[in-house]
Amino acid sequence: MTELHLWLRHEPRTTERRTPVVPSDARRLVENGVTLTVEESPQRIFPIEEYEAVGARVAPAGSWVSAPRNTVILGLKELPDEPKELTHRHIFFGHAYKGQPGASDLLRRFGAGGGALLDLEYLVDENGRRLAAFGFWAGYLGAALAVLQHRGRLVAPLTPTSKEELDKTLQPAAGDEEFSALVIGALGRSGRGARVAFSTAGIEPTCWDLPETQNLDRPALLTHDVLVNCVLATTPVPPFLREPDLDDPTRRLRTVSDVTCDVGSPLNVLPVYDRTTEWDDPVRQLSDRPPLDLIAIDNLPSLLPRESSTDFSAALLPQLLEFETGGAWGRCLDLFRTKSRELGIAVGEGELGHV
Ligand SMILES: NC(=O)c1ccc[n+]([C@@H]2O[C@H](COP(=O)([O-])OP(=O)(O)OC[C@H]3O[C@@H](n4cnc5c(N)ncnc54)[C@H](O)[C@@H]3O)[C@@H](O)[C@H]2O)c1
């Protein structure tokens, strides 16, 4: 019987309605002997009563700070700024290993408290393949928003919705002009999502992945009306779009949706803009000669909180059930220690179960 005590925390970011564990999977955890505490949260897409009904304990929002030390705290996005010393093991997306703003501060908080970050982005199998990710829904939404913008039907501000409602808006209407679309990174998780959304909208996109961009045919790229970029770049490659392409009078391309959102990174394949767009103002015009609109939203799956949480939770559940023995968590812990030490931060040597 596992002794794992898992604590599902409230997300401080007010627009974040997703959760890494949905009530039906909470039931499976409890049935398998996990002690599960779930914090109340005003915005989580699943009400607290659904967790309580499957045997979870309920705690106030933010009360993880005083949870017993051996509790594993589970969330998705950033922690609040306090406490300064983090004593627990935390599972979430830390964004702390690529020199991001605030990365070293976060690792120092773990170092100071003796806790550990088990970063969901690096929860991988022995071949380095991600075990739980939101990519499919990112691509689905990236393509859906591009379709709506291109058809003149994108309504701002964007608000979280359901797939059913979104799909209704994607149906082609009388008078809609046909257009061509290109998905790059089409074989990945988000690329697959983008293809499914296009299909719902009645569009058959051109699909490119690594082989098709090896000798990039930029003129061919520019003959598409809509581009959805879904690549996961790991080494620098020639950009898909450059500043001069914006002024190219022969360009057909009118709408770009950048799911990847590597803005500011040396790996950015779309270095033609300098900041992401937001739910309040999702589209920015990059050029008016001829027009080119950009959508670059870096929290797309949050727009479909129920569907994206349900898929993510289903992928995470088997890993949580193997928390004490699972090699994937051991790899997360090793990486946390390596990255902390690279910054000169002292970290403990405890086993996964007793950090
Ligand atoms: N905007 C958002 O809200 C959001 C959410 C989740 C993920 N993402 C980002 O989306 C990107 C893709 O994530 P994923 O989960 O789909 O990754 P993935 O690894 O499943 O797929 C990436 C695909 O890109 C392809 N690729 C890599 N380099 C390429 C190149 N130069 N040319 C053509 N194809 C190339 C790969 O072969 C692969 O098929 C990541 O950068 C991820 O951080 C964004």
Q: Predicted segment positions?
A:
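N-terminal beta-loop-helix "entrance" segment that forms/cooperates
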Residues: 37-59
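Short glycine-/small-residue-rich Rossmann-like dinucleotide-binding loops
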Residues: 77-78, 94-95, 231-236, 260-261, ...
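Phosphate/diphosphate ligand-binding glycine-rich loop within oxidoreductases
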Residues: 71-152
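Adenosine-phosphate binding glycine-rich loop
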Residues: 116, 121-169, 261-355
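Glycine-rich phosphate/diphosphate-binding loop of Rossmann-like nucleotide-binding domains
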Residues: 10, 14-41, 155-232
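Rossmann-like adenosine-cofactor binding region
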Residues: 210-290
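Glycine/threonine-rich flexible loop motifs
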Residues: 15-20, 83-85, 100-101, 234-242, ...
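Short amphipathic alpha-helix with an adjacent loop that forms part of the alpha/beta core around
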Residues: 63-67, 82-84, 216-221, 248
